[in-house]
Structures are given as C-alpha cells and as structure tokens.
C-alpha cells in the first residue's frame, strides 16, 4: 500500500491512504540505514488493520525543513506582524532565502493590521515584494483560495499570530495561542507537535515559532540564487561569479543606482553574505586549531 505520513507521535507514524489513516511503525532496518520517516513522506507500507502496520520504504523527497522535520512541502505561509512585534524585513528575507533555497513557494501574510494607524508604510512594503514576484496577503479571504490542493506550512516569528490565524481558518484545530510578553516583547511558544490537517481542500501544518532563523545557504552563489531579483539580473553581470559587491560592470549595482532595485533587500543580501563569510572564516580557524 502507498500513502503519506500525516502525523508522527511517540514512535508511531500515521499514514493516510485513500482517505483512511493507518497507525504504523518503522521497520528496524530504517535505523540501520540512518533513515527516519517524517511527516510529509510518501511511503510504502503494509497493514492488517488500521492500528497495526509497518512502513516498508520511503520515496525520494523533493524538499525538507529541519525545524520541525517536515518534507515534501508545496508552499509556506510566512506570517509577519505589522506591529507587536514590529514588521521586520530582515527576518522576512531570512525566511524567504530559506524557502527559495528549498524550492518551496512563499506566501507572505501580514497580521495585526488593525494595530496600525494607517497602511501607508505596509502598502509600500507590499508593493516592493509583489514587484519581486511574491504573493502578499492581508486577509484570510485572500489566503484561503491559495491552500487548495497544496501542502502548506505556516511559519513565522513567535507572537505574530500563527495559531490565531489557523484557528480562524480551521476552528476545529483549537490551537493554543500565546500573548506577547510585555517584558520581552516576544510571544510564548504554543505549538508543540507537527501534524497535517485537511483544510480548504488542502493540507496544512503548523510549525513552532522562531525567535531567530538560521538558513542553510553557505555560499555566495546559492545566496544569489535565493534572491529572485538578483538571480534575474546576475545574468547580465560581466563576471559569472559576481557577488554584487565590488566587481565592475555589475548589473545588480547598476539597477540599484537607477532605482530599479529595492535598497532594503540589497542591504539584507549584503548582511547575509557577510554572515556566510564570517561563518566560513570561523570554521577555518576551528579546523586550523585541530
């Protein structure tokens, strides 16, 4: 039988096949091979009934996220709050870099718009991201049609209202929500488990909130590929390995000078590039000491 893992709990894997969910375990040979089944995996399994089955094999994955481990994702809704906590373009771009690198389609959702006096600033931000090619939503009415026939994960900084949004989309989930701590300005983690839920003709998964995010991109080329607007422009740079920092005849810097590239995104790119280089230097020093 074939199916997809929709939940994992205490060593059991719940596999959905033709609308029926089977409780299964992984064969011991998975541990010997260093393989671990994850939510989202397509698997071959055997089962005598719905409560006692075994996973026999795992199909190749198209992508994966580490925190939490979840695989074969179509798209991700990145929830950013307009206020409390304040909108943070740097953090949003970290999420977008990760998703671009993983080849997961991003959807940007802005929460807590009611806390703003007006939408002038956030409308300007929306226009910039839409010009790059990103889908940008203000309401669940805009978001809901995008969920059909997709596996969607929800992610974002703690306190941005992920669980609140999911409870509005699917009240039957009854996810716990946490308020912002006045002393820390951060939300309490309220999401503890990862499961797929059938919502609006698609499958969604909630993921634990992040107060920070480390992306897996570790070189300039992959970073460039993870910024769509830089990726498009880089074909016109004189040097194929252009980092868009000091090289002559750089199409990215020319676009920036002409106002065709958003300065905020370019500054974040430079910061991420610097972080990559610093990590590399730190790694070299550690290796040298050994």
From Swiss-Prot:
Binds 1 zinc ion per subunit. Zn(2+) binds at residues 237, 242, 244, 250. The keyword Cytoplasm applies. It is found in: Cytoplasm. It holds the Pfam family RsgA_GTPase. GO terms for biological process: ribosomal small subunit biogenesis. Its cofactor is Zn(2+). The keyword Cytoplasm applies. InterPro entries: G_CP_dom, NA-bd_OB-fold, P-loop_NTPase, Ribosome_biogen_GTPase_RsgA, RsgA_GTPase_dom, RsgA_N. Residues 62-213 form the CP-type G domain. Its main location: cytoplasm. GTP binds at residues 111-114, 156-164. Its EC number is 3.6.1.-. NCBIfam families: ribosome small subunit-dependent GTPase A. Belongs to the TRAFAC class YlqF/YawG GTPase family. RsgA subfamily. Monomer. Associates with 30S ribosomal subunit, binds 16S rRNA. One of several proteins that assist in the late maturation steps of the functional core of the 30S ribosomal subunit. Helps release RbfA from mature subunits. May play a role in the assembly of ribosomal proteins into the subunit. Circularly permuted GTPase that catalyzes slow GTP hydrolysis, GTPase activity is stimulated by the 30S ribosomal subunit. This is Small ribosomal subunit biogenesis GTPase RsgA.
């Amino acid at each position: 039988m074939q199916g997809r893992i929709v939940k994992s709990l205490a060593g059991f894997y719940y596999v959905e096949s033709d609308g029926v969910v089977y409780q299964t375990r992984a064969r011991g040979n998975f541990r010997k091979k260093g393989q671990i089944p994850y939510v989202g995996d397509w698997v071959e399994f055997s089962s005598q009934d719905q409560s006692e089955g075994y996973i026999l094999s795992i199909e190749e994955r198209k992508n994966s996220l580490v925190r939490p481990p979840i695989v074969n994702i179509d798209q991700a809704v990145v929830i950013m709050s307009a206020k409390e906590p304040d909108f943070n373009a740097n953090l949003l771009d970290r999420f977008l870099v990760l998703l671009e690198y993983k080849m997961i389609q991003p959807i940007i959702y802005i929460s807590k718009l009611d806390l703003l006096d007006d939408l002038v600033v956030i409308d300007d931000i929306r226009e910039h991201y839409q010009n790059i090619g990103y889908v940008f939503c203000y309401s669940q009415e805009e978001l809901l049609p995008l969920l059909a026939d997709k596996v969607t994960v929800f992610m974002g900084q703690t306190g941005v209202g992920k669980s609140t949004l999911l409870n509005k989309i699917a009240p039957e989930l009854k996810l716990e929500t946490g308020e912002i701590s006045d002393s820390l300005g951060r939300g309490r983690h309220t999401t503890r488990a990862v499961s797929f839920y059938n919502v609006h003709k698609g499958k969604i998964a909630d993921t634990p909130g992040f107060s920070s995010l480390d992306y897996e991109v570790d070189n300039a080329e992959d970073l460039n590929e993870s910024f769509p607007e830089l990726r498009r422009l880089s074909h016109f740079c004189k040097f194929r390995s252009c980092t868009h920092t000091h090289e002559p005849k750089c199409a990215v810097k020319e676009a920036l000078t002409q106002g065709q590239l958003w300065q905020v995104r370019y500054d974040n790119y430079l910061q991420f590039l610097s972080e990559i280089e610093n990590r590399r230097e730190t790694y070299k020093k550690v290796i040298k000491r050994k």
